[in-house]
Amino acid sequence: MVVFSKITVVLAGLATVASAVPTGTSRKSTFTVNQKARPVAQAKAINLPGMYASALSKYGAAVPASVKAAAESGTAVTTPEANDVEYLTPVNVGGTTLNLDFDTGSADLWVFSSELSSSESTGHSLYKPSSNATKLAGYSWSITYGDQSSASGDVYKDFVVVGGVKASPQAVEAASQISQQFVNDKNNDGLLGLAFSSINTVKPKSQTTFFDTVKGQLDSPLFAVTLKHNAPGTYDFGFVDKNKYTGSLTYAQVDSSQGFWSFTADGYKIGSKSGGSIQGIADTGTTLLLLPDNVVSDYYGQVSGAQQDSSAGGYTVPCSAQLPDFTVTIGSYNAVVPGSLINYAPLQSGSSTCFGGIQSNSGLGFSIFGDIFLKSQYVVFDANGPRLGFAPQA
């Protein structure tokens, strides 16, 4: 089952109290969205190649035939005991609390809604337009992912509250049709995109993201992400929390011309081997780290037993392998991804073969720095510049 492009956990968090910070004569806000762990009631199936296919198609990359075939065959694993929690983000949308996936790789706020049939909506919290909501006549939205999961529907202007900060009016994309893959994941009720508004998919006119709507209310027009492995993390809006990282932040300029948080890393290191620059996107909505073929080959060339497995839809490694760290150089800063994060998940429950957390970007032309990378870093998404700040997590 594939939910957006994030599978192992539904990354998000529990909105907590927003602290209003006076700045001059105006009141500005900062707030933190804390992730909240929720026990999984039963083992959860994960379509590993489907997850990979979704990440590729999200950016318009061709999905290799072997990956597509593996995704359609439904290769799955059950959630290991060590990973038996999910992290959910309650967000107030039009007066209803929904669990949304925060995604820096997209710019839509779409939700399960009362427009869905009972068979599509059972087990989900549903958006019901508030009494002050306005339906945008003639407006629509539609998304399709690499595993053929899809959703579409109508557009409303309504209010959205995260951490006590209210976006109003905010475009809310209400699902009126949804595929079975989304229906099956009872824990997630939609997505809150945090990329640039220029890539919002609403037709005939794109709409602004939640962040763009509220950034004028924030103490600083930024948010910072601390994702964790097997533990709750946070999203900080309007401020940088110096207690969450060590040393100093290193900034990289962002090229937002394509609507993404795109930056260029100066190089990479794998053990004693090093390589050149990598252009990529910081994406909390993608689980894997997708890199150019030569970098992927460099990495798995140092792992005994690693192989490109067409039946699995990607590179696999022995689950018992001690994988090397992968280091991304940004200026003078070395962002280290521990090898333990790259040994991602067993192909099947009890399998001794694991799916690799680093996979090919399939000739996409840029890399995707997903959660495998982000879980090792404190990352600041700063609209001023724009720029990205990186530091090791405390």
Swiss-Prot record:
E.C. number: 3.4.23.20
Positions of the propeptide removed during maturation: 21-71
Pfam family for this entry, one: Asp
Top enzyme class: hydrolase
Residues passing through the membrane, by range: none
GO biological process, one term: proteolysis
UniProt-listed PROSITE patterns: ASP_PROTEASE (PS00141), PEPTIDASE_A1 (PS51767)
Active site, renumbered: 103, 283
Record's keyword terms, sorted: Aspartyl protease, Disulfide bond, Glycoprotein, Hydrolase, Protease, Secreted, Signal, Zymogen
Signal sequence range: 1-20
GO MF annotation list: aspartic-type endopeptidase activity
Stated role: Secreted aspartic endopeptidase that allows assimilation of proteinaceous substrates. The scissile peptide bond is attacked by a nucleophilic water molecule activated by two aspartic residues in the active site. Shows a broad primary substrate specificity. Favors hydrophobic residues at the P1 and P1' positions, but can also activate trypsinogen and hydrolyze the B chain of insulin between positions 'Gly-20' and 'Glu-21'.
UniProt-recorded name of the protein: Penicillopepsin-2
Taxonomic lineage: Eukaryota, Fungi, Dikarya, Ascomycota, Pezizomycotina
